[in-house]
Amino acid sequence: MISTNDFRTGLTIELDGEVYQVIEFQHVKPGKGSPFVRSKLRNLMTGAVIEKTFNAGEKVPKAHVDRREVQYLYNDGDNFYCMDMETYDQFPLTKEQFGDAINYVKENTNLWVLFFKDKVIGVELPNFVELKVIDTPPGIKGDTASGGSKPATLETGYVVQVPFFVEVGDVLQIDTRTGQYIKRV
């Protein structure tokens, strides 16, 4: 059990049999009444975000989430196969379990799979990945001054907005949290 006074961003707690991660929290001490903690929580199984208010000092059960490093190997259309980096066991993940990670991983990419009570609840990516541009319209000379952008298709099939100077074959750094172009590598 953990006190709501000890909430930190990223902490995982268990509510109603579900696992939630604390996204935001705020300790509030009103002039009248007892203090409370206002929090924003993400359900790690469904991805839904809820707002919940706790009394200050209230005890909630801490969720023990196991984070294992894996290497993405390949997919067969419906399943995404990964290998545990400690035991070298291979196991499949469904599209739903893999989530948005589909847009950012290529074969042999290392990532983390989150387990709760031996059940996969999510996939955690590195903050930045490097992907190659396979298709983008050519930039027109003089367009760079306007600071505009154009779409570029990456090797995973993901489409991202990039500056005009980016060309086919360039390797780009992409932020997996926002899905945005960071820089050309």
From Swiss-Prot:
Subcellular location: Cytoplasm
SUPFAM superfamilies xrefs: Nucleic acid-binding proteins, Translation proteins SH3-like domain
Superkingdom field: Bacteria
Record bears the keyword Protein biosynthesis: yes
InterPro entries on file: Elong-fact-P_C, NA-bd_OB-fold, Rib_uL2_dom2, Transl_elong_fac_P/YeiP, Transl_elong_KOW-like, Transl_elong_P/YeiP_cen, Transl_elong_P/YeiP_CS, Transl_elongation_fac_P
MF terms in GO: translation elongation factor activity
Protein's job: Involved in peptide bond synthesis. Stimulates efficient translation and peptide-bond synthesis on native or reconstituted 70S ribosomes in vitro. Probably functions indirectly by altering the affinity of the ribosome for aminoacyl-tRNA, thus increasing their reactivity as acceptors for peptidyl transferase.
Protein name, UniProt field: Elongation factor P
